[in-house]
A protein has these predicted regions:
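FMN-binding flavodoxin-like domain, especially the glycine-rich phosphate-binding loop
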Residues: 2-4, 14-17, 21-37, 47-147
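Aromatic-flanked redox-active Cys/Sec active sites in thiol-based oxidoreductases
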Residues: 8-12
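Short amphipathic alpha-helix with an adjacent loop that forms part of the alpha/beta core around
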Residues: 42-45
Length: 147
């Protein structure tokens, strides 16, 4: 059974809404286990087949919690090579954070990233939450087809 982590940080609740919808979509595909969380230790990352990171953009950057997690994983030599990576997030002005996450996943950890990231300006409406569910489903289906 494939394991997916949907990890997010959310100050306003917008990225959290996206994360929950993505996790819901991922769970709708059989033979996958989905963990939705706002915090994990770096050592835990290696146990997942896919890691989806929700990083809202604040002041043209990703949240410090996400930076710290990736830095710890790198320092501790956590191998994520070949795992599926994806990023999503809400933003008010610029939306860089999910792009930065994908760059780190691809260039530092050699993950197989799904591009482009899923970006939502401000609060996701019902249509956008449907897109989020489809995004999660797409990740789950990619794991099943690759298994």
């Amino acid at each position: 059974m494939s394991k997916i982590l949907v990890l997010y940080y959310s100050r306003t609740g917008n990225t959290e809404k996206m994360a929950k919808a993505i996790a819901e979509g991922a769970k709708n595909v059989g033979n996958v286990e989905v963990e939705l969380n706002y915090h994990v230790e770096a050592e835990e990352l290696g146990k997942f087949d896919a890691i989806l990171v929700g990083a809202p953009t604040y002041h043209h950057d990703m949240p410090m919690d996400m930076k710290t997690l990736f830095e710890e994983a790198a320092v501790k030599g956590i191998s994520l090579k070949g795992k599926v990576g994806a990023a999503f997030g809400s933003y008010g002005w610029s939306g860089e954070a999910p792009k930065f996450v994908l760059e780190i996943m691809k260039n530092k950890f050699e993950m197989l990233v799904l591009e482009p990231p899923l970006l939502v300006r401000y609060e996701p409406d019902q249509n956008v939450l449907g897109v989020c569910r489809d995004f999660g489903k797409r990740v789950s289906e990619s794991l099943i087809h690759d298994a």
